[in-house]
Regions:
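Intrinsic-disorder/low-complexity peptide segments enriched for small residues
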Residues: 4, 9, 338, 483, ...
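N-terminal compositionally biased, intrinsically disordered segments and leader/signal-like regions
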Residues: 18, 174-175, 419, 542, ...
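Membrane-proximal helix-loop-helix interfaces that form the catalytic/acceptor-binding platform
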Residues: 19-492
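Extracellular and organelle-lumenal recognition/adhesion modules and their flexible linkers in secreted
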Residues: 45, 497-633
Length: 633
């Protein structure tokens, strides 16, 4: 019996012996997949809002103005902005060349995840972690953006790799300490949460550092701080003078963390299940690693601390927590999650099967479930320009075009490449009164192509529809929409306003209030996103401060739940026929069910006019509008 057991042991042992050559082949495949996913038609990925925010700062002629007027008012360290300032002077504003360095650092980050997993635990952990990182939309998305996240992630991982060599390595060299210092310095130039992550890594090292290495370790840290010192005025200006690094965000929901984890697994049930089973496989097989190591706790602590700081700050001061905030600490959670694998838990070919499953299911979910190569490669700035060109070719001089966007130059970047002249771009500083004036000046044009990006307030869309109520076509992209509209019925068009009252009602001189219209919000579809009201009026003389009011009331008690009016300065209209609009957004804090809407004209200027008709318009939630971050179904 003893001999038989020994024989079985000898037969089983080589079966699970690691095969370094196969491991090298597998990591090569992982890197190849990561490269394909990030570099695939990279030049066709249009610039996004955040990228334009950075690129437009590079237009300063000299570096001094770039720092004073471009960097100081921003909320990011100088690193990526300064790199782009030099980079675009060599390669221009080509999407491929601007994005390429960040895609390459994203690929490099996948390899660094492998190295750290192997360094901290073993090759299996590195392979599986890198495979997951290669196919997660979270990392693919940020690798295709010319923003600090891919670069910051790369340098955080590089610092962590040097950190292990300095703190736990059997032999350390001067190169290790220099690499540790330089990578820590690079982290400080990328993003404020990469600075926080670098600080956490450094402080953690103090808990485990051998006594004889403390001097060199502190010198490395001091060296990184000295290198960072020239940018301290920028750091001070952005954090303590400007006083905001994220106030434009909304407060995080209680479900933020679970939503984030699903996002990193591509919101795909099969991918989540496959990764979950693989992580638990050592437990299921009874071959999990029982080795006690502080690195598991360190990896988890880094993520938890960063998340807790951002979450608490977002609730108590101003919102700063977003998905990108966690990109610098998340890799360590993934490495720890796969750390139950021992070197001999699986055979080499079983390792290959696990890697293949992660890559195949991850790629399938990225491409099909998340539609990444559709949504990422077709976005508002470029696609609105495409639709404008198509509509111009089809309708000629019968159509005019208007676009609203946060950054006017971003829309202009793509629209300037068309041959369209009868178009206008409104930006964040434009007011609705300007749009009304432009519409009136061009009222003889029978059609309108109207686009918006960056989730502009729906009152702009309602105003466009109020003047051109027949919808020919609507197209949505990530945070963007384009409508082809007409004043009169055309082939394949539909009237999108819902009449509430079309009996003319005159307002005499000095009259401020008039008739109200009420309707049940239960008549709206379940997926309604915004409600708009359009009042069509006729005024013989110029009027001002004429607004539409929307009240949302409880259907049973009639208690007022929400009140909204347009701005008085937007209520200026020249003599003639005009459309006055207002809009509200339904969200978790204001749902339409069990409510009624009351709407009326507030003639604050008390000029005579006639209210000819009042109608409502609604928009529906389209998952595509948030599809790069949220589930598509």
């Amino acid at each position: 019996m003893k001999n038989e057991n020994m024989r079985k042991h000898r037969l089983r042992k080589p079966h699970n012996t690691p095969d370094p050559k196969l491991d090298y082949l597998l990591i090569g495949v992982v890197i190849l997949v990561a490269a394909l996913l990030r570099l695939w038609k990279l030049g066709q990925v249009p610039f996004m809002h955040d990228e334009f925010s950075a690129l437009l700062r590079t237009r300063f002629d000299n570096f001094h103005d770039f720092i004073q007027q471009g960097i100081m008012p921003d909320s990011h360290p100088i690193g990526v902005e300064a790199f782009l300032w030099f980079w675009v002077r060599v390669f221009g504003w080509s999407e491929f060349w601007v994005k390429l360095p960040f895609a390459l650092m994203g690929i490099g980050s996948v390899y660094l995840v492998y190295l750290i997993g192997k360094q901290w635990f073993n090759r299996k952990v590195g392979l599986f972690s890198a495979a997951f990182f290669a196919v997660s939309q979270f990392t693919v998305f940020y690798s295709q953006l010319a923003r600090p996240y891919s670069a910051g992630l790369f340098f955080v991982l590089l610092m962590a790799w040097f950190w292990y060599r300095v703190v736990f390595g059997t032999k350390t060299t001067t190169k290790d300490y220099v690499g540790f210092a330089l990578s820590a310095w690079a982290c400080s130039l990328m993003q404020y949460f990469s600075i926080a992550q670098a600080g956490l890594i450094f402080l953690t090292g103090l808990l485990f550092l051998p006594k004889e290495r403390r001097k060199a370790y502190w010198l490395s840290g001091i060296g990184a701080v000295v290198l960072f010192a020239p940018t301290l005025p920028i750091f001070y200006q952005q954090l303590f003078v400007s006083g905001s690094i994220g106030g434009w965000l909304s407060a995080p929901k209680p479900s933020f963390l679970t939503d984030f984890l699903q996002y990193t697994m591509n919101y795909d049930t099969l991918f989540i299940f496959a990764v979950g089973i693989i992580i638990l496989l050592p437990v299921i097989l009874g071959r999990r690693s029982k080795r006690s190591t502080p690195l598991r706790w360190a990896g988890i602590a880094w993520f938890v601390i960063i998340f807790a700081i951002a979450f608490i700050y977002s609730l108590t001061r101003e919102p700063i927590l977003q998905r990108s905030t966690l990109i610098f600490s998340y890799p360590f959670v993934i490495i720890v999650a796969f750390s139950l694998f021992k070197n001999r838990t699986l055979s080499p070919w079983q390792n290959a099967l696990v890697v293949a499953v992660i890559l195949f299911v991850g790629c399938a979910s990225l491409i099909m479930t998340r539609r990444h190569y559709d949504l990422m490669y077709h976005q508002g700035f470029d696609q609105i320009a495409v639709e404008i060109q198509k509509d111009k070719e089809e309708f000629g001089d019968q159509i005019q075009f208007a676009t609203h966007t946060e950054i006017g130059d971003a829309a202009e970047f793509y629209q300037a490449k068309t041959d369209i002249e009868n178009r206008i771009v409104f930006n964040r500083y434009s007011n609705l009164g300007e749009f009304n004036e432009w519409l009136y000046d061009h009222k003889e044009t029978p059609m309108l192509g109207f686009g918006w990006t960056d989730y502009v307030h729906p009152i702009w869309e309602v105003t466009a529809v109020g003047n051109y109520p027949y919808l020919i076509e609507q197209k949505d992209w990530f945070t963007s929409r384009y409508l082809t509209l007409s004043k009169t019925p055309t082939e394949n068009s539909r009237y999108v306003l819902h009449t509430l009252d079309d009996k003319p009602y005159p307002y005499a001189k000095g009259q401020e209030w008039g008739r109200a219209s009420v309707f049940s919000c239960d008549s709206l579809p379940d997926d309604v996103e915004a409600l708009g009201i359009v009042a069509h009026i006729h005024n013989e003389t110029e009027i001002s401060n004429c607004m539409v009011v929307i009240e949302i009331r409880d259907a049973e008690s009639d208690s007022l739940l929400f009140w909204h009016s347009t701005l008085p300065e937007d209520g200026h209209f020249v003599a003639g026929d005009n459309a006055i609009a207002n809009a509200i957004i339904f969200d978790n804090g204001l749902s339409p069910k069990g409510k009624k809407a009351k709407t009326y004209l507030w003639n604050q200027g008390k000029k005579p006019l006639v209210l000819n008709k009042i109608s409502y318009y609604f928009t529906r939630k389209d998952p595509v509008l948030t599809g790069l971050y949220e589930p598509l179904n």
